[in-house]
Every structure is written in structure tokens, then in C-alpha cells.
């Protein structure tokens, strides 16, 4: 699919329209959960006038959440390949790498960041990503808009071989377990969860509310909780467990994406020997809900915080 950008790809998959209300209620939980399958990803070259190629596709079906989540994608950025620099003027996008390292660009300033990490591109700014290594990088992409439609303006710059800043001159988030904060009985659950809000609502200009990092150690769980104005998508970075929404329960594992709609009770439990690790994206149903979240007093999550584990 040479020289197609992410909008064209998303439109081809028929997932660009975001309805005012989701279709969650009529679909069983196990059907709403998305499972990453590399064999189903579509090859693309020169993405946003970038170098080389990649394989990617839509993971979570956005019709299962309320709000302007335009897409939630998963894929692989090939060695020595890039997504060229491009602007978003009515939406915001966040590139994520789950391993390796990549050169992230915001407004033509570039820095090398080791994964797992995420870099948001705020509305009205330009971004790009380049994999300078000899190994493929596991990649994700999330987009939230002011409305239901995606926009992009390509600059024709692959960002290959550019000079690097020693310190990134833009917001970023590392998914580093050493930075997590212990939360006892989170949302009324069992054991001690490890949690951090890595990107606050003030980072974003759209109804995008936050990006969180959550780890449930062996034997831990969260209690049931529903948010009246915020939808969430949970991506399982590692481990296995179960999710319960309402009366439905389903197993989950690494690579799964779980949409949780507004007013939908949800709880998670870890299983097996490996901690259950999540990347969480929160999207407000509208800007009024986003402003209310920003004006609310912390903490944003239930549970009792223990001694800080770092910033």
C-alpha cells in the first residue's frame, strides 16, 4: 500500500466514524475484546512520506466506547523505517513503542527514546517517528479528535539522519515499573496494585483525558468501578488475567485491547505467575467532562496510596 497515510488506511477499514453513543450494550464482552494478530496486519510503505515500511492495523473497535476515539492501532515499525513528519490540526495522536528504541520528533525537534514509551502529539503540532536500529520495533498508535474525523498534513520529511537533542524537548512517558506507586485495595480490590498517571489531562487539548500505567502483581485485583463521563481502553502489555464488565467475565492476555464504556462497571484480576500490566487510555465524552476532570481534586483513582515509588 505505497504512499498511503494512516487516514487512508483507517478509512479503508471502515472504522473512522465515531458515533455519539457506543454500541457496547448489545455485544458480549468476549466479542468486544480485541486480540493482536501480526498475521492480520497490513503492510504499508512511505507512511506520511516516511522511509521504509511497517505493518499495522486497527486493534480496538472504537464503536464500543463513547467519545471521539478515532482509532487505536497496533503494529510493527520495520528497521530503518519511519513515519514521516505530519501535522494534526483537529485531532491528537500518540505513538507508542513497546520495546527497543526510536527517534521521536515533535515540531522538527528529535530525540532518541527507549521503549516502552509514548510521545503524544498535541493538536496543532507535527510529529514523526523513526526506527534507526536493525530490529523491528513493536508499535502502537492512538488518535483522539475534537470531532469524529481524522486530519493530517504531510511535510514530506522522513526525519531520517537528523540531529538529535540529548533531552527530549516535548512531553513523553516511560512505562517504567520503577516509577509506579503502590495502591492498596485499588477500587476495593485485593492486594497492592502498582499505578501511575503518566500523562495528565492538561497535556491534551482534545477530550483525551489521560494515559495511565497499571500493574497487578500475582494475586492482585481491582474492585469494580464505573466512570460516568470517561471511556477507557486497556491494552495488556504483559501477563494474563480476567476482566469483568457488568455480569460478563472473559480471560485476557498480552496483546489484548479491552474497551470500557462510560457507566460500565469493570474489574480486573491477575492470573498466573507474571504480573498483569496495562497501558490505559482515558477519553472524556466531551470537553465539559474533560474540564470537570481537570478541576477535580486528586486522587483520580480509588485505593489508598502507600509510600511513593518515585516520580
Located regions from the model:
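Positively charged n-region of N-terminal signal peptides that target proteins for export
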Residues: 1-5
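Bacterial N-terminal signal peptides
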Residues: 8-20
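A short, N-terminal "cap"/entry segment at the start of jelly-roll beta-barrel domains
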Residues: 23-69, 84, 149-208, 223, ...
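Ligand-binding loop in jelly-roll beta-barrel domains
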Residues: 67, 123-149, 242, 254, ...
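Conserved short histidine dyad/triad with adjacent acidic residue
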Residues: 73-88, 212-227
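Glycine- and acidic-residue-biased ligand/ion/polar-headgroup-sensing regions
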Residues: 90-102, 229-242, 246
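Short acidic-glycine-tyrosine-enriched beta hairpin
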Residues: 109-124, 247-263
Amino acid at each position: 500500500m505505497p504512499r498511503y497515510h494512516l487516514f487512508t488506511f483507517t478509512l479503508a477499514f471502515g472504522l473512522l466514524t465515531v458515533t455519539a453513543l457506543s454500541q457496547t450494550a448489545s455485544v458480549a464482552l468476549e466479542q468486544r475484546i480485541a486480540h493482536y494478530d501480526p498475521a492480520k496486519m497490513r503492510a504499508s510503505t512511505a507512511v506520511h512520506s516516511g522511509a521504509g515500511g511497517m505493518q499495522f492495523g486497527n486493534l480496538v473497535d472504537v464503536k464500543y466506547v463513547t467519545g471521539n476515539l478515532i482509532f487505536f492501532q497496533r503494529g510493527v515499525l520495520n528497521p530503518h523505517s519511519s513515519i514521516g513528519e505530519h501535522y494534526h490540526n483537529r485531532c491528537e495522536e500518540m505513538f507508542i513503542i513497546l520495546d527497543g528504541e526510536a527517534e521521536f520528533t515533535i515540531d522538527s525537534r528529535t530525540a532518541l527514546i527507549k521503549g516502552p514509551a509514548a510521545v503524544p502529539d498535541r493538536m496543532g503540532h507535527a510529529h514523526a517517528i523513526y526506527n534507526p536500529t536493525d530490529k523491528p520495533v513493536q508499535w502502537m498508535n492512538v488518535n483522539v479528535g475534537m470531532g469524529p474525523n481524522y486530519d493530517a498534513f504531510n511535510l514530506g520529511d522522513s526525519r531520517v539522519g537528523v540531529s538529535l537533542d540529548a533531552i527530549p524537548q516535548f512531553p513523553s512517558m516511560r512505562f517504567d515499573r520503577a516509577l509506579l506507586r503502590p495502591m492498596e485495595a485499588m477500587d476495593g480490590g485485593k492486594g497492592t496494585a502498582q499505578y501511575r498517571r503518566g500523562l495528565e489531562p492538561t497535556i491534551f487539548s482534545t477530550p483525551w483525558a489521560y494515559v495511565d500505567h497499571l500493574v497487578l502483581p500475582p494475586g492482585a485485583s481491582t474492585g469494580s468501578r464505573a466512570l460516568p463521563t470517561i471511556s477507557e481502553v486497556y491494552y495488556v502489555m504483559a501477563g494474563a488475567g480476567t476482566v469483568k464488565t457488568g455480569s460478563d467475565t472473559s480471560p485476557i492476555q498480552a496483546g489484548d485491547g479491552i474497551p470500557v464504556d462510560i457507566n460500565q462497571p469493570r474489574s480486573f484480576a491477575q492470573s498466573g505467575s507474571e504480573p498483569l500490566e496495562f497501558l490505559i487510555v482515558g477519553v472524556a465524552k466531551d470537553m465539559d467532562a474533560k474540564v470537570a476532570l481537570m478541576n477535580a481534586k486528586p486522587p483520580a483513582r480509588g485505593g489508598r496510596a502507600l509510600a511513593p515509588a518515585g516520580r
